Amino acid sequence: MAASKQTSAGPLVGAVVQGTNSTRFLVFNSKTAELVCSHQVELTQEYPKEGWVEQDPKEILKSVYECIAKACEKLAEVNIDISNIKAIGVSNQRETTVVWDKFTGDPLYNAVVWLDLRTQSTVETLTKKIPGNSNFVKSKTGLPLSTYFSAVKLRWMLDNLRPIQKAVEEGRAMFGTIDSWLIWCMTGGVNGGIHCTDVTNACRTMLFNIHSLEWDKDLCDFFEIPMSILPNVCSSSEIYGLMTSGALEGVPISGCLGDQSAALVGQMCFHEGQAKNTYGTGCFLLCNTGQKCVFSEHGLLTTLAYKLGKNKPVFYALEGSVAIAGAVIRWLRDNFEIITTSGEVENLAREVGTSYGCYFVPAFSGLYAPYWEPSARGIICGLTQFTNKCHIAFAALEAVCFQTREILDAMNRDCGIPLSHLQVDGGMTNNRILMQLQADILHIPVVKSVMPETTALGAAMAAGAAEGVNVWSLEPEDLSTILMERYEPQIQATESEIRFSTWKRAVMKSMGWVTAKDPENGDNPVFSCLPLGFFIVSSMTLLIGARCVSTAEE
């Protein structure tokens, strides 16, 4: 029998999307931005102690190779030659920390995940040794001293794990976030693997100077981290090395972005003032501030958005996080038990079309930006005899939208550029009631890409546009038009403001329920790690083990 004829699909670009709960490999047509095929593998997490979250770096690596192999098989099934794949991009969960032996290629400990809380005492110790300038860390990194970021995780490893201490002493240790681990392994590992990261991941370590775009010696000295174990910092779009094994051996890895930056690129937010919001377990809002490094006065983080080429300028962003988005739906299902599947919330909310004066403040572990109030706890208020589960479901969806409104108001104040619309992605955007509510509460249009894989698309765009690959043009006139679903506000601005002001009254009532106590006495230590009352949403035990609702995972 004659072999079936293989077809040319034009230049294709692959994207590894390595998230907290799963790994995916997606293949795009670089001329149309269409998704050609994909494969996903679920991952396990380990919880050795309360508040600890770990993953096996080898399992993560294996999942990447499995996803690539299965996606290539799917291409073959439709007679597409895998030689059409010209480049691979990597998008990854940020901050998660790996240390490995450069001579054996073995991890020296499990990956310590971004939401791990074990470093609270480490943060307290470091806080006490901050120089006279209380903004010493934030002024260089845009970040507060927190358990969230990689430097304190690495400091804990060096303080507590003798195998890592010994490897550092003997010059065998390599440090990296997940992108570094994957790229090193995929480009050869012990046989010449490239030890690198990109600026969007480096800036989340708390060791990287976001002004000079280099590892900062003062920061490394402060955290007592040897600079010799750090990866080389590259742009988000350049050839780092070639795949040395697997179905795509010889294909260049030429794009690398932290997941939220990848979503920003995939949403094509290339202009100052453009913002995207990813709705998953929580919400991650990034606003492009252009080539200006804007420091927030309203509790937002300053971060690097992207640097799409060695000689291209760096773009900055303000980032705000909402802890409870999809997580509130999970709570309604698992704790409140008024639904059995997440999809039921939309149906319940549609039945009534209103909360009937019921407001839900999901401050399960305190309030976040712009309040930063650890004493708050979740409340449902405005209940009457008429209130039923449909109204509570509606109020839960409204809560996600009100929290987003507060973050975007903070961004508008920091940037001085009111948003004309909000671009959205993530699993919760499939909830049409939620999207309409968001437009009503923001009183600006909410724009959703019909193609939901924006994180993967951003990584693919960066890889395809790299010098030496050049199969994906990022020039405005060449960017593919992506179909958008648009939600326009359907209520008057005055009604929106009344509902929002009532929400803020409910927020005030949620405050002062608990007193932060000494964590050494066994009380909840979530907030002890952040100076001046500032804490990061990732330090939430509630989120540990929560299944990611988003297509773009942290």
Curated annotation (Swiss-Prot):
Q: Which domain of life is it from?
A: Eukaryota
The UniProt entry lists the main location of this chain as mitochondrion
What pathway is this protein said to act in by its record?
Polyol metabolism; glycerol degradation via glycerol kinase pathway; sn-glycerol 3-phosphate from glycerol: step 1/1
Q: Which residues bind ATP?
A: R24, T281, G326, G427, M428, T429, N430, N431
Where would you find this protein in the cell? Mitochondrion outer membrane; Cytoplasm
Which keywords appear in this protein's UniProt record, sorted alphabetically? ATP-binding, Cytoplasm, Differentiation, Glycerol metabolism, Kinase, Membrane, Mitochondrion, Mitochondrion outer membrane, Nucleotide-binding, Spermatogenesis, Transferase, Transmembrane, Transmembrane helix
Q: How does gene deletion manifest?
A: Male mice are infertile due to dysfunctional spermatozoa, which exhibit unregulated ATP production, disordered mitochondrial sheath formation, abnormal mitochondrial morphology, and defective sperm tail. Spermatozoa cannot transit the uterotubal junction due to reduced motility leading to male infertility. Spermatids exhibit abnormal arrangement of crescent-like mitochondria, which causes a disorganization of the mitochondrial sheath.
Taken from the record, one Pfam family name reads FGGY_C
Q: What is its EC number?
A: 2.7.1.30
| Annotated GO MF terms | ATP binding; glycerol kinase activity
Query: Looking at the UniProt record for this protein, which Gene Ontology cellular component terms does it annotate, in alphabetical order?
Result: mitochondrial outer membrane; mitochondrion; sperm midpiece; sperm mitochondrial sheath
Provide one Gene Ontology biological process annotation.
glycerol catabolic process
For binding substrate, which residues are annotated in this chain's numbering?
A: T20, R94, Y148, D259
- Top enzyme category: transferase
Give the transmembrane region(s): 526-546
Query: Mind telling me which NCBIfam families this protein's record contains?
Result: glycerol_kin (TIGR01311), PRK00047.1 (NF000756)
The entry assigns this protein to a family as follows: Belongs to the FGGY kinase family.
Question: Tell me, how does this one assemble?
Answer: Interacts with PLD6. Interacts with ARMC12.
Q: Which PANTHER family match?
A: GLYCEROL KINASE 2, SUGAR KINASE
Name by which UniProt lists this protein: Glycerol kinase 2
Recorded source organism is Mus musculus
Q: Which gene encodes it?
A: Gk2
